[in-house]
Amino acid sequence: MSNNAIKDWPEDERPREKLLKRGAAALSDAELLALVLRTGDAAAGKSAIDLGRELLERFDGNLRELAQAELNELQQIKGLGLAKAASIKAAFTLGKRFQARRLETLERFTSPAQVFDFFHHELRDNRKELFLTLLLDGKNRITRKVQVSEGSLNQSIVHPREVFAPAVRESAAAVIFIHNHPSGDPAPSREDHEITRRLNEAGEILGIKVLDHIIIGDGAYFSFVESGLL
């Protein structure tokens, strides 16, 4: 059956019809990818679902790795050209933006778990470390998210002067620091401990409270406050 065009399949087995009848959650990852790809490779006798399955196999079924893939990596699948690769990249990017913009609906943060819930989709797929600062007002309401750095963290890159400049400029009452560990393990390094100590001291001098520093891994997080280190 996989060598036939999807339009020739029984109606209840076609991804689009299945989605319309049963909802998107009823589709497999390969079927969802097929809808993004729209067509297969007729010359090779591959349906869009076949291409979706090959993509998943190429990345060991890991959607996180697939989301991180560059266009040239996606095109290594025979029958998957630039247009299809761009569609996949666009779909994953749109999902990330949706997660990021959920932040705008929040009135205030109440716990490290809530921070993790809102940011792990955005940060866990990055191959580089990103350091973010959340600016909050006196009622712990988010006013802005600032990206401080991208790349391996060290004390010269994450310097208190650069980190607190937006908070001072916008009269923030408090800040929350967030960064990711591309390895997936959120356990803090010695450098993470030292950076947190320095930033907390700077916050005390400036009168800007550091509410937490949260490290995001793959499905887990580390909170300096919950661990009694801040």
Curated annotation (Swiss-Prot):
Binding site for Zn(2+): H179, H181, D192
Keywords linked to the UniProt accession: Hydrolase, Metal-binding, Metalloprotease, Protease, Zinc
GO terms (BP aspect): proteolysis
Domain MPN, chain residue ranges per copy: 108-230
Keyword Protease: yes
Gene3D superfamilies: 5' to 3' exonuclease, C-terminal subdomain, Cytidine Deaminase, domain 2
The keyword Translocase is annotated on this UniProt entry: no
Chain positions of motif JAMM motif: 179-192
GO molecular function, one term: metal ion binding
Cross-referenced PROSITE patterns: MPN, UPF0758
InterPro entries the UniProt entry points to: MPN, RadC_JAB, RuvA_2-like, UPF0758, UPF0758_CS, UPF0758_N
Family, per entry: Belongs to the UPF0758 family.
This protein's name: UPF0758 protein Glov_0523
Protein's organism: Trichlorobacter lovleyi (strain ATCC BAA-1151 / DSM 17278 / SZ) (Geobacter lovleyi)
